[in-house]
């Protein structure tokens, strides 16, 4: 009888811990922010545990479909196939838009280019331009540092520019790898979250390009807070969290923390932008 009572208590404790164990998976754009939010949430709620991992928006959504995450972070909306799969599996979700991000295009700090227009950027990324000669006059190869197909940022840029990336584009695992590549490649171009640049210091040997929507127009930087607030930067986007309804009660206090003063301060302090109310 004592053994049965002990077993019941252990199981009850295990259930209690499971109810306060939150898994967050997905977007590499959001992963540093999610870690910071989780760490600060834990300081106030030490009865909770929050495990955060990246891997890309596609991985987060796949984990959602497989029942392996409570929150799927994504830098893009769900696509038609994913919506159909959720419906087929009987998974109902709630969508939270908790911050906004801008995608920054970067080159080596010594590269002789400060701004680029969308037409030229398209020709660089889709492989139409093989060298920088039409852009800077330098007859050196263009080396593209990008992401895998399951990356929300990869999908976002493809849709915004209506392109297929060059087959020669390097597929990197995340922001850190792209920045590292550009630091050592004087003819490289890559794209990363502006929040990552701001959060990891702008003193690195890289340069953030201004984006011109039309040739000759004023270039806008993704680091320009006022421009982002006015929605003047072409590559800015909302950041999503997809949450199965079965996990909502468990994660609601974490979501409330994100939306509260402390969470909002972390969002802006990490180089991301608040959603206008």
Give the location of each predicted region.
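Glycine/small-residue-rich loop that forms an oxyanion/phosphate-binding "nest" at active or ligand-binding sites
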Residues: 89
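Exported/periplasmic ABC-transporter solute-binding proteins
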Residues: 15-72, 76-80, 84, 93-101, ...
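Sec-dependent N-terminal signal peptides
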Residues: 3-12
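Intrinsically disordered, low-complexity segments enriched in small/polar residues
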Residues: 1-4, 143
């Amino acid at each position: 009888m004592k053994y049965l009572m002990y077993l019941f208590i252990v199981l009850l404790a295990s259930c209690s811990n499971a109810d306060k164990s939150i898994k967050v998976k997905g977007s590499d754009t959001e992963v540093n922010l999610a870690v910071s939010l989780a760490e600060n949430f834990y300081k106030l709620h030490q009865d909770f545990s929050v495990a955060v991992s990246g891997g890309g928006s596609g991985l987060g959504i796949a984990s959602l479909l497989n029942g392996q995450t409570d929150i799927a972070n994504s830098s893009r909306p769900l696509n038609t196939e994913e919506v159909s799969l959720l419906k087929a599996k009987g998974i109902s979700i709630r969508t939270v838009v908790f911050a906004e991000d801008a995608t920054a295009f970067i080159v080596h700090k010594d590269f002789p280019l400060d701004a680029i227009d969308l037409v030229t950027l398209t020709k660089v990324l889709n492989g139409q331009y093989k060298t920088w000669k039409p852009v800077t006059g330098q007859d050196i190869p263009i080396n593209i540092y990008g992401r895998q197909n399951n990356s929300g940022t990869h999908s976002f840029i493809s849709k915004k520019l209506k392109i297929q990336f060059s087959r020669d584009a390097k597929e990197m695992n995340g922001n850190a790898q792209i920045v590292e590549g550009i630091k050592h490649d004087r003819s490289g171009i890559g794209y990363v979250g502006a929040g990552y640049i701001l959060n990891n210091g702008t003193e690195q040997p890289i340069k953030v390009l201004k984006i011109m929507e039309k040739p000759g127009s004023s270039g806008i930087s993704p680091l320009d807070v006022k421009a982002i607030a006015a929605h003047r930067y072409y590559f800015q986007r909302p950041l999503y969290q997809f949450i199965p309804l079965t996990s909502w009660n468990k994660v609601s206090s974490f979501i409330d923390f994100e939306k509260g003063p402390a969470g909002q301060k972390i969002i802006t302090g990490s180089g991301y932008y608040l959603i206008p109310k």
